[in-house]
């Protein structure tokens, strides 16, 4: 896949049209926060409509618009300079949901069964074991899952 440079492209738009780009992580004024949430909700509604209409062109448009508005929010919340590091930490955390061994996967299945009766199944692919909830095929976190530590990055 080709790499996307959405933050810098949207920063160009913000600079051109005078939209805020904050240099330090912060929560903007309530009206700006409400605008950001409203814009994201609007684009998400367009995605839902495009999916319902089975219209791939409109799906692509909605996804691009969501990425554009989301990138604008990252800039307006002053997260632009730290976003790669933040995203990489979320990626690391998400990947820790996978199990490194069949034993870890079996312990994970037992953990969910003992915790609340959740039935799970193990799937191995390329030396990685994944645990899925049987009811809906949702990925379940390994017993060795490690949550993202975004706080240390934002300090």
Task: Tell me the role of every PLM-derived stretch.
Residues 1-63, 67-155:
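Flexible "arm" and connector segments at domain edges
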């Amino acid at each position: 896949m080709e790499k996307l440079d959405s933050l810098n492209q949207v920063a160009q738009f913000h600079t051109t049209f005078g939209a805020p780009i904050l240099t330090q992580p912060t929560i903007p004024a309530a009206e700006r926060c409400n605008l950001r949430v409203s814009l994201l909700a609007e684009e998400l509604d367009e995605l839902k409509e495009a999916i319902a209409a089975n219209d791939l062109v409109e799906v692509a448009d909605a996804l691009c618009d969501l990425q554009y508005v989301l990138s604008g929010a990252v800039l307006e919340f002053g997260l632009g300079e730290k976003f790669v590091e933040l995203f990489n930490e979320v990626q690391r955390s998400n990947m820790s949901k996978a199990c490194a061994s069949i034993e870890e996967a079996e312990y994970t299945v037992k953990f969910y069964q003992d915790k609340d009766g959740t039935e799970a199944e193990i799937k191995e692919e390329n030396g990685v074991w994944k645990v899925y909830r049987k009811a809906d095929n949702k990925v379940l976190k390994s017993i060795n899952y490690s949550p993202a530590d975004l706080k240390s990055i934002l300090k």
